Amino acid sequence: MNLSAAHHQISLSDGNNIPLIGLGTYSDPRPVPGKTYVAVKTAIDEGYRHIDGAYVYHNEHEVGEAIREKIAEGKVKREEIFYCGKLWNTEHVPSMVLPALERTLKALKLDYIDLYIIELPMAFKPGKEIYPRDENGRIIYDKTNLCATWEALEACKDAGLVKSLGVSNFNRRQLELILNKPGLKYKPVTNQVECHPYFTQTKLLKFCQQHDIVIVAHSPLGTCRNPSWVNVSSPPLLNDELLTSLGKKYNKTQAQIVLRFNIQRGIVVIPKSFTPERIKENFQIFDFSLTEEEMKDIDALNKNVRYVELLMWSDHPEYPFHDEY
């Protein structure tokens, strides 16, 4: 794979391309107003052409404003930018899918997006509330029919509102549900999952490669250490001694080593940052490469432990992480 800062796209099975690095725009807690706008502009100036967002991040309007401004400046053309949006759990009902995508397009003020994915395979009670709860504070689940939801996504593609379709946090069984669906029109081209040296996803990666599905790694640098939703029993990834020593060898940060590891495996990375220096640093991964031996050594760091377990929803019938992969 001959990658450079200017050319770092890989092909999707539907004929479209996806840049191997994108800017993640999720923040917990929510970013201060204006912060996402600045981050996206910084990223585009630096050479990023892929922005990963979602309705539930509450900042798609800022992402759109930044993209449109950079297009108006002549820095980029719309077709050079790759935006991924996500369908949230409360909108899996087929009749709600198109309006959900249209709301994203309205927030972005764009005519189409490049990739629309089902954010999680777990449906919640349909409606306006993002986290619908019962009187005991528990999330109200809904019966999931992933195939019906997928058909509604296919209709969005037919309407020209999105170029590619994918999923996120799906296990093998859930991917097979879609892949084996009678009358399947468009295959999922991506599966966005947690993936990094402590959680290498080798089996899921192999399965996805067999079906021409690209893995997009969320939390590619590990995550924040918020114990309310993060498994903090696994040590912070970026403190690892091997990554530190490789960083010294290549004059790179541990984060750059980790990101390089995944892109050399053909995995797309979407590190999130709202700090201009970090946004720039994360992109500087095209001027070195790891040896085969180093790749094996990093791969051997795998602990098979997730940071993002979503245990609060582990009793959902479609909770994806009970299965081995």
From Swiss-Prot:
Residue numbers of Phosphoserine PTMs: 228
Q: Where does NADP(+) bind?
A: 22-26, 52, 168-169, 192, 218-223, 272-282
Looking up InterPro entries in the UniProt record yields: AKR (IPR020471), AKR1D1 (IPR044483), Aldo/ket_reductase_CS (IPR018170), NADP_OxRdtase_dom (IPR023210), NADP_OxRdtase_dom_sf (IPR036812)
GO biological process terms, alphabetically, are: androgen metabolic process; bile acid biosynthetic process; bile acid catabolic process; C21-steroid hormone metabolic process; cholesterol catabolic process; digestion
Catalytic activity reads: 5beta-cholestan-3-one + NADP(+) = cholest-4-en-3-one + NADPH + H(+); 4,5beta-dihydrocortisone + NADP(+) = cortisone + NADPH + H(+); cortisol + NADPH + H(+) = 5beta-dihydrocortisol + NADP(+); corticosterone + NADPH + H(+) = 5beta-dihydrocorticosterone + NADP(+)
* EC number(s) given by UniProt: 1.3.1.3
Location of this chain's protein in the cell: Cytoplasm
Q: What keywords tag this UniProt record?
A: Bile acid catabolism, Cytoplasm, Lipid degradation, Lipid metabolism, NADP, Oxidoreductase, Phosphoprotein, Steroid metabolism
Q: Which GO terms describe its cellular component?
A: cytosol
Do you know which Pfam families this protein is assigned to? Aldo_ket_red
Residues annotated for substrate binding in this entry: 26, 57, 88, 119, 131, 229
Question: Which superkingdom?
Answer: Eukaryota
- Give the activity regulation note: Subject to inhibition by high substrate concentrations. Inhibited by testosterone concentrations above 10 uM. Inhibited by the primary and secondary bile acids chenodeoxycholic acid and ursodeoxycholic acid.
Major location category of this protein: cytoplasm
Q: Give one GO term, molecular function aspect.
A: Delta4-3-oxosteroid 5beta-reductase activity
Q: Where is the active site?
A: 57
Give the family from UniProt.
Answer: Belongs to the aldo/keto reductase family.
* Job description of the protein: Catalyzes the stereospecific NADPH-dependent reduction of the C4-C5 double bond of bile acid intermediates and steroid hormones carrying a delta(4)-3-one structure to yield an A/B cis-ring junction. This cis-configuration is crucial for bile acid biosynthesis and plays important roles in steroid metabolism. Capable of reducing a broad range of delta-(4)-3-ketosteroids from C18 (such as, 17beta-hydroxyestr-4-en-3-one) to C27 (such as, 7alpha-hydroxycholest-4-en-3-one).
Q: Which PANTHER family match?
A: ALDO/KETO REDUCTASE (PTHR11732)
Name-wise, this protein is Aldo-keto reductase family 1 member D1
- The record lists the organism as Mus musculus
Annotated gene: Akr1d1
